[in-house]
Amino acid sequence: MSKITKKVEELVKPILERYGFDLVDIEFKKEGKSHFLRVYIDKPGGITIDDCQLVSEELSEKLDIVDPIPFSYYLEVSSPGVDRPLVTDRDFIRNKGKVVDVFLNQPFLNRTRITGELVEKNEKSLILIVDKEKIVIPIENIKKVKLAIRF
């Protein structure tokens, strides 16, 4: 985490805590000639545009005072989107009981992608229900976990 994203995290966390929102991620990157500061937030039941606007306005005020970025940039506050990977313990807790896609580094049960109901994630493994059977996948073999999108 860069100095800028650490400072932004310090500034945004009290705002999010006040409203019961979760910080998912902070990105600061250059795209073309412009710099973007992106703050991804969530809450149980999902984040709304009004929630994003509220956080954006309050964070913008704090950023103007502290001024951790010495050049112009665009501030974007948004939901993480349905296709983002589950990363934090809070992500896994929030999505317990939902169907996830697990992408693996090495084949497990002859597959590199396993879809199943999320039961639990701990320090050593991810536990799923697949075809009514409990399977335990070692954490070190997991490349990425995302919510399964059903059409």
UniProtKB/Swiss-Prot annotation:
Localization of this protein: Cytoplasm
Domain of life: Bacteria
Keyword terms of this UniProt record: Cytoplasm, Ribosome biogenesis
Entry's Gene Ontology cellular component terms: cytosol
Swiss-Prot/TrEMBL GO biological process terms: ribosomal small subunit assembly; translation
InterPro entries the record matches: Ribosome_maturation_RimP, RimP_C, RimP_C_sf, RimP_N, RimP_N_sf
HAMAP family reported for this sequence: RimP
Main function: Required for maturation of 30S ribosomal subunits.
Family: Belongs to the RimP family.
Name used for this protein in its record: Ribosome maturation factor RimP
Record organism: Caldicellulosiruptor bescii (strain ATCC BAA-1888 / DSM 6725 / KCTC 15123 / Z-1320)
Designated gene of the protein: rimP
